[in-house]
Design a protein with these regions (language model features):
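Short, contiguous, pocket-lining structural segments
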Residues: 1, 18, 45
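Acidic donor-binding loop at a coil-to-helix junction in glycosyltransferase catalytic cores
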Residues: 1-8
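Carbohydrate-recognition loop of C-type lectin domains
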Residues: 13
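A structural signal for short, well-ordered beta-strand segments and their strand-loop junctions
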Residues: 17-19, 64-65
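Catalytic core of nucleotide-sugar-dependent glycosyltransferases
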Residues: 21-30, 36-61, 72, 82-103
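Active-site anion-handling motifs in enzyme catalytic cores
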Residues: 55, 71-74, 117-118, 143
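Amphipathic alpha-helical repeat scaffolds of TPR domains
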Residues: 67-79
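Membrane-interface aromatic/basic loop that binds lipid-linked glycans or pyrophosphate carriers
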Residues: 82-144
Length: 144
């Protein structure tokens, strides 16, 4: 993942230069990881990457690393909420448990995300119901 590679590169760099230039020209092709079938890599790789960065970063970045981990847990849970319920139930429950294990860090989140995290941990049925409704009404039936 690009994020992990950038973290390692910048961690080892003695200096860096900012250039306002984007060399990437992403083209999403049929069958790419973005549009392909959902699998365990799609679910757990972003979480693993954030956890690796959190474990490797210094104290001055711990809070930012924790926020990044919490946000990706919220995002992945939301994605699993709109996917096939039966197929991803165990994964959704596992992500919920990972989020619940980080409960003491919820105070780092924005008010909105703190509310979402609490709903996922304390009333997941309510989150799933309201989130699916939100996706149907305001996102045209798709969330990504």
């Amino acid at each position: 993942e690009d994020i992990l590679m950038n973290f390692y590169l910048f961690s080892e760099a003695k200096q860096s230069v900012y250039e306002d230039f984007c060399p990437y020209r992403y083209i999403i092709r049929k069958g790419s990881a973005v549009t392909g079938r959902k699998n365990t890599h799609w679910i757990y790789d972003p979480i693993r990457v954030r956890q690796l960065i959190l474990d490797a970063c210094g104290e001055e970045l711990k809070e930012d690393g924790e926020i990044a981990l919490l946000r990706v847990l919220l995002y992945v849970y939301a994605l699993l909420t709109v996917e096939d319920r039966k197929k991803f139930r165990a994964d959704r429950d596992k992500v919920q448990a990972l989020l619940a294990a980080e409960r003491e860090s919820f105070s780092l989140l924005t008010r909105r995300n703190r509310l979402l995290a609490g709903a996922i941990c304390d009333a997941p049925w309510l989150f799933r119901l309201t989130f699916r409704l939100y996706v149907r009404l305001f996102r045209g039936g798709e969330y990504a």
